A protein has these predicted regions:
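Alpha-to-beta junction loops
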Residues: 157-162, 185-187
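Catalytic beta-strand/loop signature of glycosyltransferases that borders the donor
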Residues: 166, 189-193
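Acidic donor-binding loop at a coil-to-helix junction in glycosyltransferase catalytic cores
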Residues: 172
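Glycine-rich active-site/cofactor-binding loop and its immediate structural neighborhood
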Residues: 34-73
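Hydrophobic residues within well-ordered alpha-helices
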Residues: 12, 120, 154-156, 175-182
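Acidic beta-strand-loop-alpha-helix segment within the catalytic core
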Residues: 60-152, 200-220
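N-terminal subdomain of lithium-sensitive/metallo-dependent phosphomonoesterases centered on the IMPase/IPPase/PAP
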Residues: 1-43, 129-137, 153, 193-195, ...
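A short, glycine/Asx- and small/polar-enriched loop/turn
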Residues: 32-36, 156-159, 203-206
Length: 220
């Protein structure tokens, strides 16, 4: 975590010296407040990494007035790279991931969900009875488990329709994946009142949330 954080932070500070940088690994950064900032999780899915599973990610996001406008989610063990373009749309890049050569870009678009046969993705390491009870309110045709912010990317690629999270997360866990999801036409709302999730909150804690493709009939 710390080695990756040092490398990423140095690069971001050099490229964007005027932007506030919030990173999970630098506790001193958590006291900062700004309407526009960068937010980083250098290793999302620590349990997956320690257990040598492939679904851990690097998350980098740019947030403006509470909205994650740009995001990068990189899953190095899976050779998958997702990010938003300047126009706000999201893509998955494939290829050699060369610094100087952009690979093939595949535009991302969420699914058109069938509420009689939904595809649900949930946390691999933090799934609990409350989550299962909530998922039970839907007609589920397929259930996936995944770690880290890859769950947002599965929604963004159209591989899943719904991702509920009834557990603690921090803004650096979700901002990049949220940006990628929004850029693919998806939504992320609070669990309690279905209002849009915002960023830059005191303490950097997220409420419970639901990420989904428009058309999913959300349950209470």
């Amino acid at each position: 975590d710390e080695a990756a954080d040092a490398l990423i932070s140095a690069g971001l500070r050099a490229a964007f010296p005027d932007l506030v940088l919030i990173t999970e690994e630098q506790a001193a950064s958590h006291a900062q407040r700004a309407s526009t900032f960068l937010i980083v999780d250098p290793l999302d899915g620590t349990k997956e990494f320690v257990q040598r599973r492939g679904d851990f990610t690097v998350n980098i996001a740019y947030v403006e007035h509470g909205v994650p406008l740009r995001g990068v989610v990189y899953a190095p063990a899976q050779d998958r790279l997702f990010y938003t373009l300047p126009d706000g749309t999201s893509v998955e890049e494939t290829g050699a991931f060369d610094h100087d050569i952009v690979g093939t870009l595949h535009p991302l678009s969420v699914s058109k969900p069938d509420n009689t046969a939904l595809r649900v993705v949930a946390s691999k390491s933090h799934r609990d009875a409350a989550t299962d009870d909530y998922i039970g309110k839907y007609a589920v045709a397929d259930m996936k488990s995944a770690g880290s912010s890859l769950k947002f990317c599965l929604l963004a690629t159209g591989e899943a329709d719904l991702y509920p999270r009834l557990g603690r997360t921090m803004e650096w866990d979700t901002a990049a994946g949220d940006a990628v999801l929004r850029g693919a036409g998806g939504c992320m709302v609070r669990f309690d009142d279905h209002s849009v999730l915002t960023y830059g909150k005191d303490g950097w804690d997220n409420p419970f949330f639901i990420a989904y493709a428009p058309g999913v009939q959300l349950q209470k």
